[in-house]
């Protein structure tokens, strides 16, 4: 399965919205409560696993053959990545650059997002040539 960057972003946004000290993100196969209705169950499972392996989410537990997945929270790197890509215009720019470069891996997307934000900060302060 190919990585869908939009699915990753939607998972991270959903986890951030739900998780706190009292609540975990509980995903069930037939649950349409979150902003994940555009993705198949297989896509969601795959992308949750990719987020876990990339260190973006933590305390992930799989139950009943992955028909129920519990996510404890975003990891610090997940918070940072999401903060960098929250704004839709930034996210669209990150995806555009990734397509031009020819790589949409999570590590590349994370690096591009950080660089885009750095360039926006420089532009804000008039530091770009």
Residue ranges of model-derived segments:
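N-terminal intrinsically disordered, cationic/polar leader segments
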Residues: 18, 29-32, 50, 107, ...
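Short, amphipathic alpha-helical interaction segments positioned at domain boundaries
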Residues: 66-98
């Amino acid at each position: 399965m190919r990585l869908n960057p939009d699915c990753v972003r939607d998972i991270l946004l959903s986890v951030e919205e739900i998780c706190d000290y009292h609540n975990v993100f509980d995903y069930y196969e037939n649950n349409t409560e979150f902003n994940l209705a555009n993705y198949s169950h297989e896509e969601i499972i795959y992308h949750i696993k990719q987020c876990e392996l990339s260190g973006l989410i933590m305390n992930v537990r799989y139950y009943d053959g992955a028909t129920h997945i519990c996510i404890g929270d975003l990891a610090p790197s997940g918070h940072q990545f999401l903060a960098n890509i929250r704004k839709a215009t930034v996210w669209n720019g990150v995806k555009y650059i990734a397509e031009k470069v020819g790589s949409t891996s999570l590590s590349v997307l994370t690096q591009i997002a950080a660089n885009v934000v750095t360039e926006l900060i420089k532009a804000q302060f008039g530091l770009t040539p």
